[in-house]
Amino acid sequence: WFNDLKQQCRAEMISIIDVTCQAIKHANTTRVGLLATTATVKARIYQDNLITDNIDCYTPDDADQHQVMESIYAYKSGDIAGAYSLLSPVKDRLLQAGVEKIILGCTELPLILEQEVRTSPQHYVDATEELIKKTVEWYFTHNTRNNIAA
């Protein structure tokens, strides 16, 4: 649906899915895990994009996906420690299964796993961060005024 919308829109649009998958591809990663909302996982928007580049995308089983959602809800309700205790084992199982990187495909997930992202950044791709980087790059590429400092 994104590409259809993009074709009908005059404004430049950047896809969070595309920029995240490009980051995975440029890292020469072939096995990734996906932590995201159930709707995102079931829609297969990351998986279908990655498969075109022969990148295997692993998702949590139903029980673990339920824990991901409970973790997100816990974080939103202010239970940071509870959110971490729910999400950390799911993340560990993906890494133990041999994924090279984990896509953090929901804005709360990098916050819940903040310590791990900071200490082991090689294991994570934060979709929101990838979108921000691409947006800033786009701005400076398309900015005609040379006097704006970053």
Swiss-Prot record:
| One matching Pfam family | Asp_Glu_race
Arranged from A to Z, the UniProt key words for this protein are: Isomerase
Q: Which domain of life is it from?
A: Bacteria
Name this polypeptide is given = Uncharacterized protein in pnlA 3'region
Instruction: Keyword check for Cytoplasm, yes or no.
Output: no
Query: What SUPFAM superfamilies does the annotation carry?
Result: Aspartate/glutamate racemase
| Gene Ontology molecular-function annotations | amino-acid racemase activity
The record's section on Gene3D superfamilies has: 3.40.50.1860
